[in-house]
Amino acid sequence: MPLMLAAELSVLPAWYAEQGGTVWLDSALRMKTMERQSFLPPSVNWTSEFLPIYNKVIPWGWNPSLVRRLQEAGFPDTAYPSVERMKRIRQISGRQTAVKVLRRLCRHIGGNIPTLGEAFVLSSTEKVKAFVLSHPRALLKAPWSGSGRGIQYVSGSFTIPLEGWIRHILTTQHEVIGEPFYDKLLDFAMEFFADEWGQVHFIGYSLFETDKRGVYKENLLAADRVIEERISTYVSAEILHQVGRALQVELAEVIKGSYEGYLGVDMMICRTQNGGYAIHPCVEINLRMNMGVVARLIYDNYVCDGVQDRKSVV
């Protein structure tokens, strides 16, 4: 199934690749089919051959198997991260990084901005149990998983199946992330680009939906200002700008030039206990290309400004 999904989505980079870039497809037949499609961007090239003629490779996200494949194919070492950078990318891709950035961010922006959000790194079954029993509703997360997977919703009881899941995650990943449950009203993200000099740049917003389990469903295609206006019905645009500026500083400090490429920070607008609204400024950090960036680039590059529709990327 993962290989089939990868094959089906191999055309997707055509919509966000740089002009003159080359998109690799899984088969020559698929490449010939794509070359005949008039609706696809004409500014990219296609190839089905995995040949070491490119100095730079831009994948959806980096993993050891891709690096190994590039090495075996003879690609130059400029085309992929070094062993040390891969270790660092894995480290900062874990949810522990989001916990760290959330704490630093809340200190950075001070008490004048309505924020909320706590997260805890738990290293033993006893600590996880104490966390679960002390929260009427909460989430437990595996440090490394994606798209809503690796998440358990708990309601103050410590069951045998839950204990089994916890022990498995602690055995394989050594820690579990615990987060209180919040009264979420809106999912959105700020999207960024980390450059080769270690600077992090804000590139826009994304507005997305998840199912009841927190699994990603779709992204809205809309102008950046429209998304900001939607979020600003809960918190002001100036607050969003302050959070974005603080995030650029904190992300650059965490990444420290180890990663070059797109990344996104998932956020939430939540209802507070007194009936007001607050922003959770760092729910997840996606250190890779993501559907929010894809939606942003598709709209900015291919949709007429001012067009409003319920079209989405799914």
Model-derived features: positions:
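Peripheral (often C-terminal) accessory segments that flank ATP-dependent C-N-forming ligase machineries
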Residues: C304-V314
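Phosphate-binding site of ATP-dependent enzymes
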Residues: P136, T159-K217, I269-C282, N290
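Residue-level marker for buried hydrophobic side chains located in beta-strands
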Residues: V23, A138-L139, L263, P281
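Conserved N-proximal alpha/beta basic substrate-recognition cap immediately N-terminal to
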Residues: L3-L12, W24-L133, G146
